[in-house]
């Protein structure tokens, strides 16, 4: 009879041999994404301009490659506030909880680039802005796919929803720095 033996020497991430307990818990963000992607939108791929307030923030943080998610957000901007209202109806303080989680993801991303959240170094922010946003997207993606209420969405919807939610957090100054609040 064959003997199955596994030797694990160094583990640097999550290891689950079955369904993780956190996968049995629903996510507020999934409610928001589900509502965002369920609406009909007209996507304007020609207009690549941004309102001046958003353009100032993009320039202030030196955001380059990830500007595309802000462009995508423009098509869904009216729907996202409705989605947060629906989240608040289903979960007490749903919007605030989701916003707090996104802000905490930003702080985790800053830590990866050795940026002190209490003494923001704008030189480092400008150098790593796209990477910081990318890290937040990765954190959010991992979080979403580990939650119980993801099953009713298509992967493409989830990916668009992630970009829209992260872009909204950028516009609301939860991620990256507000040009009006810096020294």
Protein language model annotation of sequence segments:
Residues 1-34:
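Long, low-complexity intrinsically disordered regions enriched in small/polar
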Residues 35, 39-183:
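Long, low-complexity, intrinsically disordered terminal regions
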